[in-house]
Amino acid sequence: MVVGTTGAAKTRTVITPNLLECVGSYVVTDPKGNLYCQWGDYLKTQGYRVVRLSFIHPEKSVHYNPLNYVTTTQQIQQLSSVLINKNKSGHADPFWDDSLLMLLNSLIAYVKECPGVLPAEENFHAILELLRMAGRGNSIRKDSVLSQAMENLHEYNEKSWAYKQFQNVNQSPDKTFNTIIATTIAKFCSMDTDELAEMMQDDEIDIISIGQQKTAVFVEVSDSDRSMDALINLFFTQTMNQLCIYADEECENNQLPVPVRFFMDDFATNCKIENFENMISNIRSRKISVILILQSLSQLENSYGQSAHTIVDDCDTLIYMGENDPETAHSIAVRCNKTTHTILHMPICTSWIFRRGEKPFMCRNMELDDYLQEKKIISSPIKRKHRKEIWEQDIIPLCS
């Protein structure tokens, strides 16, 4: 885990050097797409399959179809839960979130169950089209095209799970039903674009292959536009789950042939992985590891609540690069037996390192240019502003 304020050079000093070590596969959160532009070509020369999954410019992205990884009703429910994101819905009454979940469950299940839907048509665009068919018109239930489609599916398969889920919602009064439909449409309006429809029409990523061959997946996310957060969260949730299932069911010793490391920048802001507090405790045995990048520990608590403590405890290494949150500074001060004032005013370009079983120590941050020179790697093609060393004369001696 890496904790540091904006501008602490977390990407330059931690993510980039680890990425360029070229050990195993990587799944990297890439705000603005800079990492892909800087290092994509280099990784190709090192034998990597390089994948650009862009939620900023979906028209330039490889295709990703979440429904391609759904085969059970449990996976359907997980997909719906991530997309609805009950914890951040803002609904005081759980009835509305539960209704949205059941409706979305029924739509996804219909696409997977219906014999008239071709495999190539099993995508998110088909779900949105079904949602548009749910209007009842003049408040008459039988006027709903979706209702009739569900009835037809029930005639074909009396045990249809899609039909059962839909009936749970369809039994609502007309006014309530229409509100559920309108709320669901509004929730997914930001995803209803031609570019996303093209990107999600089929799947080119092949998640399992990430654990089979050296692959670098750059997940481009916006640090200002949060409209794609649900899809981003879904991708990370599905990727971790699929790799764990593959390791458990098909790999020797339940370990991936190629280790996979996730670099999750701005983790607590745009990524809320389903059951991550449980997952992080178990993924290590499958040769899956995670580097979480945060601005503060309180930021993690805001997203994960009490589960944040479990996540922190399961990280063997903590790199603290300094920030302005007094609560986080106090927590770090207790760990290294320093005052909160000392931690809040630690020198620029230094970090405290905490490793399980070792005494904490302070060190100077790695300079990326020195690392590139040592490894004889061509410097970044993207020009950057000169970073002047501030307060260099005040940096304390390194502790060993």
State each model region's role.
Residues 370-384:
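C-terminal alpha-helical "lid" subdomain
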Residues 295-299:
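Conserved H-loop
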Residues 3-288, 303, 338-362, 380-400:
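P-loop NTPase motor domains
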Residues 292-294, 314:
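Catalytic or ion-translocation cores adjacent to nucleophile or general acid/base/metal-coordination motifs
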Residues 306-331:
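Conserved P-loop NTPase catalytic core
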Residues 42-43, 67-68, 306-310, 334-337, ...:
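Short secondary-structure boundary/capping segments
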Residues 53-54, 294, 322:
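Short beta->alpha connector loops at strand-helix junctions that form conserved
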